[in-house]
A protein has these predicted regions:
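Right-hand nucleic-acid polymerase module
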Residues: 1-292, 304-587
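Short hydrophobic/aromatic beta-strand micro-patches
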Residues: 299-303
Length: 587
């Protein structure tokens, strides 16, 4: 049975965050109000759920410091086994068992030594414990009704606060690191990150560019576009949208369970489409309902005569689970033909991409069930719906965007790195792909950057042989095996070096890449002779090896404030804001 505790005059359920525990206690009290004798079924069900949420080695109200200490303990457990078990294969099996009983996915490395080094590293345990804890925390929030249109859409307020704080810490950490390449160019790491797909603006722009290319190819092929919304059965939804109350059909599924269900539905539909000779291509976007349950939006292009059969196949497999429940036939699969008179397929999808990136030109977030999500004050700041969606995808590890039936994007990105002189003798389709990837700009008299020649993904698709080519695309990424020094030793990794044409794989077109190193990371360490009356030799009389040794720098007094203010610890003041000064040492 749940343990009731009292703090500052407020009773709550032990093991839950206080605001959650107070509400859970109130619901328990309401369930047993006026009851004499055996407890009613409602009380037993709620008590059993609370016991399941609080019965864990990591309580839901655990701090990040407690998770770090637990990581140290479990890493030491693995290290203790390493001291007594000397066979690498046997030791690996033992450590995989330790991970399994603690609910952690063991390392998937093939090398036994790599697995052992990870399992004896507290940092590896911290990363995995945080992931497991965050998902357990968020699942508990869903089951307790803390994720809904009224309480906080998509994710709980605590999780979105934690994610925003994490992003800020990551940004500060990147800004504090300077990188230098072999040409002597120096950049702060956050500036380098902004030049890649970690930059949301660039990522959104690339997605729009790629989909616009698909739209152009569909028009050339005289294919039609179909906008599809695919949702889960009722048992995956924790909260009823209209009443904002607990769904009696809910069976404890997580958003990842919902995503796995939709993936299975799509896999079965795709297999049936192959048997029927239907080959759709396009883009799918994963979004959360107000209660965190995943649903899909897809824009699929196909031949006009295939639309009807495609819809039948999708509905058949989507309704295979609980297809007779109320509303299933009306809401499980929704399709809408894209009308060119109302706008292009790119315009249909633009809103859904913006909802997942920056809320630009979106207006209100309106879910498929009619729930409106607006910016909401959480603590001392206003959290936008896009920030909640980003936190939702991060905590559950859900891939939000995926293209279907189009050429891979990695050769596109690698081709952009190639200099013009490297492809002078390349086949025409390689040259066409290179030209499609290049964007040319100029600066006007006001200092504004003007694009004189935009990149064209449709041309790239044609150069690759078109859509729906499977493994038969013309251009591939060239790679070489390189030994990379990592945290856990040398690892052989496939590093991209350029592209090659499938018809002549022995001819490679090298891309421009740089070797980056962190400035100021390496610190010279040398031996220092003892200073005592016994050995007080001068530099001239000292042995050559001692005279050549570098003297170590004076070590300042230890200050743990930087460590506690790093990624390893969250430090919040009474207003919920990050404040590293709380850990400043005082006399």
């Amino acid at each position: 049975m749940p343990v009731i505790q009292q703090e500052n005059g407020r009773r709550s359920v032990k093991g839950l965050p206080q605001s959650w525990g107070v509400r859970a206690y109130r619901e328990l009290s309401a369930a047993q109000a006026g009851v004499i004798g055996p407890m009613p079924e409602r009380y037993k069900t709620l008590a059993a759920m609370l016991d399941g949420l609080t019965d864990s080695e990591i309580p839901l109200d655990a701090t990040d410091a407690q998770i770090c200490m637990l990581a140290e303990r479990w890493a030491n457990d693995c290290a203790s086994n390493a001291a007594t078990i000397h066979d690498a294969t046997t030791l690996r099996q033992r450590m995989e068992f330790i991970c399994g009983v603690r609910g952690i996915e063991p390392p998937g490395e093939e090398d036994d030594q790599q697995v052992i080094r990870r399992c004896t590293d507290p940092a590896w345990w911290r990363r995995n414990l945080r992931k497991v804890f965050n998902r357990k925390f968020e699942h508990a929030a869903i089951r307790l009704g803390r994720v809904s249109g009224s309480a906080g859409a998509y994710v709980s307020n605590e999780t979105v606060q934690k994610r925003i704080s994490q992003n800020r810490r990551n940004r500060k950490a990147l800004a504090a690191v300077t990188m230098e390449n072999e040409n002597g160019q120096r950049y702060q790491l956050d500036d380098l990150a902004d030049k890649g797909m970690g930059n949301k603006k660039l990522r959104k722009g690339e997605l729009m560019l790629r989909f616009a290319g698909c739209d152009a190819i569909a028009k050339e092929r005289a294919d039609v576009g179909l906008f599809v919304t695919l949702t889960c059965p009722s048992k995956f939804h924790a909260i009823l949208s209209k009443s904002d109350t607990i769904n009696p059909n809910y069976q404890g599924a997580t958003p990842r369970d919902a995503q796995d269900h939709l993936t299975d539905v799509w896999a079965r539909t795709r297999a049936q489409n192959d048997r029927d000779g239907i080959q759709p291509y396009g883009l799918r976007v994963v979004e959360p309902h107000h209660d965190g349950c995943a649903h899909w939006h897809m824009v699929m292009f196909m031949a006009p005569e295939h639309v009807e059969q495609f819809t039948k196949n999708l509905k058949r497999h989507a309704l295979a689970v609980d297809g007779d429940e109320p509303g299933a036939h009306a809401h499980r699969v929704a399709t809408e033909a894209i009308d060119p008179a109302k706008g292009s397929a790119t315009g249909y999808l633009a809103k859904y991409l913006s909802k997942n990136f920056d809320d630009e030109h979106v207006g209100e977030h309106v879910d498929e069930d009619g729930t409106i999500s607006k910016p909401k004050r959480v603590g001392r700041e206003v959290v936008t719906p896009a920030q909640r969606v980003e936190a939702w995808a991060a905590v559950w590890g859900i891939r939000q965007f995926q293209f279907v039936g189009t050429p891979p994007v990695t050769p596109w990105r690698e081709t952009r790195r190639i200099e013009a002189d490297k492809i002078a003798d390349a086949p025409d389709h390689v040259k066409a792909a290179w030209l499609a990837c290049q964007r040319e700009t100029t600066t006007d008299e006001h200092g504004e950057v003007v694009v004189t020649k935009p990149a064209d993904y449709a041309v790239y698709i044609r150069a690759q042989g078109g859509v729906l080519q499977g493994r038969d695309y013309r251009i591939h990424v060239a790679e070489r095996l390189k030994a990379v020094e990592g945290r856990y030793g040398l690892v052989d990794r496939h590093v991209p070096t350029g592209i090659y044409c499938a018809s002549a794989p022995h001819v490679q077109y090298a891309s421009t890449r740089y070797e980056w190193r962190r400035v100021g990371l390496a610190v010279g360490v040398g031996l220092r002779g003892p200073w005592s009356p016994v050995n007080n030799c001068t530099a001239d009389d000292a042995p050559f090896w001692e005279a050549a040794a570098a003297y170590s720098a004076e070590v300042p007094p230890f200050d743990d404030s930087e460590w506690f203010g790093s990624f390893d610890f969250d430090c919040f003041d009474k207003f919920g804001d990050y404040n590293p000064d709380l850990f400043t040492q005082r006399e």
